[in-house]
């Protein structure tokens, strides 16, 4: 696989790994990176099958020009280690780790990634590890997270869980996200990382709100957007 640093990544498009029709379509919309999701969108009873879907989907499409990521379950679940073991291979560019709150979270994931790379005959450190910062604890630990592991190339921000964690009202002006965005931007700079990737926008039929959110993120030094609908990809590219 091509090194994930070879191109700037602006759009990261999520789709549930356990929905074959959605998986087929996600490769057709021109996203810079595709993230097949094993976390929020996949029921516990379907996680094992979804892991195989990740491998099948990515290994069938080598050298597409799109970067391939998998979002595993968080480090404090019983699923994360097996998610990594089952999906890592030469078809993958990186792993998205949700709900990261400290450097120790990354160190545990690093051990599992290194073992999986070795088992597949891959170069140690080949895979990107992208933490999503989406809690108050994660935001306050952003500098530690950004400087803990050389595998990290960029961080991402999850506004949904962040605002739930703090009981904030997430309105269109996104004032409640300003502090977290600033913290992540500062941390990325101090860690010599690429610009962070901004939060999803849940209102998938409101293009103007998405564009406004993307512009706010860009003002804070972010380099792209997490997307949850194909229509958000070209909007992301319009801003970044």
Tell me the role of every PLM-derived stretch:
Residues 1-240:
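Expand to "…catalyze enediolate/carbanion chemistry for C-C bond making/breaking, isomerization
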């Amino acid at each position: 696989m091509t090194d994930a640093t070879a191109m700037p990544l602006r759009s990261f498009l999520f789709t549930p790994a356990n929905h074959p029709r959605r998986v087929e379509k996600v490769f057709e919309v021109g996203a810079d990176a595709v993230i097949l999701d094993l976390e929020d969108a996949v029921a516990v009873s379907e996680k094992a099958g979804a892991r195989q879907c990740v491998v099948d989907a990515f290994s069938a499409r080598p050298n597409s020009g799109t970067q391939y990521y998998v979002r595993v379950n968080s480090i404090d679940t019983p699923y994360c280690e097996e998610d990594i073991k089952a999906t890592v291979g030469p078809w993958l560019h990186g792993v998205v780790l949700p709900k990261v709150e400290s450097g120790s979270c990354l160190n545990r994931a690093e051990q599992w990634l290194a073992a999986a790379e070795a088992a597949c005959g891959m170069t140690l450190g080949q895979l990107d590890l992208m933490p999503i910062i989406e809690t108050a604890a994660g935001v306050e630990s952003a500098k530690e997270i950004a400087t803990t592991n050389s595998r990290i190339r960029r961080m991402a921000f999850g506004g949904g869980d962040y605002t739930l964690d703090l009981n904030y009202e997430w309105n269109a002006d996104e004032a409640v996200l300003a502090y977290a965005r600033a913290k992540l931007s500062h941390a990325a700079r101090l860690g010599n990382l690429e610009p962070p990737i901004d939060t999803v926008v849940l209102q998938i039929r409101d293009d103007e709100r998405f564009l406004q959110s993307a512009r706010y993120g860009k003002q804070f030094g972010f380099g792209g957007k997490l997307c949850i609908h194909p229509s958000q990809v070209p909007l992301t590219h319009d801003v970044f």
